[in-house]
Each structure stands twice: as C-alpha cells, then as structure tokens.
Amino acid sequence: MKLVQVPVGFELELFASEPMIINPIAFAWDERGRLFVIETTDYPNEIRKEGGDDKIKILEDTDGDGKADKVTVFAEGLNIPTSIMAVNGGMLISMAPDFVFLKDTDGDDVADVQEVVMTGWGKFDTHAGPSNLKYGFDNKIWGVLGYSGFDGEVSGKKFNFSQGVYRFTPTWENMEFLGRTSNNTWGLGFSEDFETFISTANGQHSVYLAMETKYAKRTVYKGTPNTATG
C-alpha cells in the first residue's frame, strides 16, 4: 500500500486482509454496498474438469468503520474464476470454459442458482482467458480476452476470436467482438465520455479503442487473393 499513488485529496485505507481473504483476483460491489471477492488458490496451475478450491466471499462492514468485519462464503467449489460483476440480481463470473450466473434466491447469502449462460472460452493458458467483466455506458456487458480465445455460439451465431474486447447484452445475447489487442489482455476501463481503454499484462500498458473493428475493415470480394468475402 505504501507504493500506491492516489489523487490529491484521497486516502488509501485497508478494508480487508488475510486470513479473512486470501489470493483475491477480482471483486464487485452489489447494490447494498457489499464486496464480492473471488478468492483463488487454483490459479494458475490447478485446472480441473470438475469442482475446485476457489470461492466467492461476501465482505461486509457492519459497524460503519470502513473495515470488513463479516465474511460469508457466497459460492465455493469453483475453478479459476477470473472476473465478477453484479447483474440481474446476482453475480456473473468468467470461469473458462464457461460464464456462470450465480444468485441467492432465499436470502441466506449463499448462491443457490448456478447457471452456465455461455460456453466456449479457452483455458489452455489460464493467464490469457476472459476477464474484466463490467457494464458499459450502453448498458451492455463488456469484457476482454487473451490468446486463449473464444470458440462458441451465442444467439445462434458462431464466434471465434481472441486477444481483444467484446460485449453482449445482460440477457447473454448479441455477442460483438469489437477490436483486437495482443496476447495477455487483462485491463478494461472507460472515461467519463465512454472512451474505451484496454491494457495487456505485457507490452501494452494502455491501448485506446478508437472504433470498432468492423468500421476499419475494407471490402473484400470473392476472387481476390484474400479468402474473406464482402
């Protein structure tokens, strides 16, 4: 914390630490001001076909002192979840090869709904999977992806892409691949004017997404050396 720089007028304070939470990889706040944190001990090497040792914990400040004093295990038995966001009254997580929707319906703060809403995310390198799920100002869900790629079907349409930024609706439909970056893409952020910035873990600390890829493509016709068709 000593090396973290914050804007003038802001202070950095510790909210939670071990043993309450270990190895946090991503977090999201819900509408009640509770912090949902992905805790992973499987990342990056323990790839499992079923089950796992990773969890999502709810951290709460119940006495208003700015520090977490209550922890609840929202979901467990997970394997390398890499992103989390609040949506549709629950939490959406990226956990390659799936995106999974988790929801508590009986008020005990434990997810009793666990639904795979999208599948096809690559897992051959856990460092380069899907991450940074968040709402855009267009009320669509945005995310980024590394070279592990996506090869799946959304809304009856086949997609195959990697290393870039994508978005889809909160009903898990209408996937759009918006633009490419490079290799190990993990960062995604928006300015106040909804300008989009992406970063990778190596080589590209900040990339500006000026426009969607579809607007930069040239028309290509059958019979040209290029195999694409316009």
Question: Where does each model-flagged region fall?
Answer:
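Beta-propeller domains with acidic blade repeats across secreted/periplasmic ectodomains
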Residues: 1-230
